[in-house]
Amino acid sequence: MTPAPAAAPERSAPGTGTVAGRVPAPAPGASVVVVLEPKTARTFPEQDEAPVMDQVGQTFSPALLIVRTGRPVKFRNSDDTLHNVNVKEEGTRVQAFNVAIPTDGVYEHTFPHDGFYRVGCDIHPAMAASLFAATTPYVTLAEDAGAFSFTDVPIGAWKITVYTAGRKLERDVDMTAGATQITIE
């Protein structure tokens, strides 16, 4: 029996490369956010469509939503009961907004700056989620073993930031054509 051919490596567009690596693995039920930011000003393409945080089964879904700063985000209520969405900046607890959303209702908001936000429902206090807003489109959640990757990263100087278990880890990355591997512990 002939073995199956190996998968072709993921290729990036000309003038770009791939950044992949490993960060501390998330604890069970937790998330590790990995952010790749340019060290010099860049413009990024618009997002295809607004991300959505839904309220379904008296739960926010997803539990952690990644959004782009300055771009719209939708908050939807798919339950058959009234909910509200109360969003506060994580560090300062400054309220971003607090709105009631009826059944099948949608509220749209644009986050003005980067960072973590706590999301709750005052009507159902057990409902809680988080949101991370970033200017860069290069934001991902690490896999269970801590692996992550970004494709089509323009060549240049970048900073990678990892948010894990209350810690913030940072490292500079010089992106060259091809693949760049990085481990952050």
Task: Please describe what each predicted stretch is.
Residues M1-E185:
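Extracytoplasmic copper-binding redox domains, predominantly the cupredoxin/blue-copper superfamily
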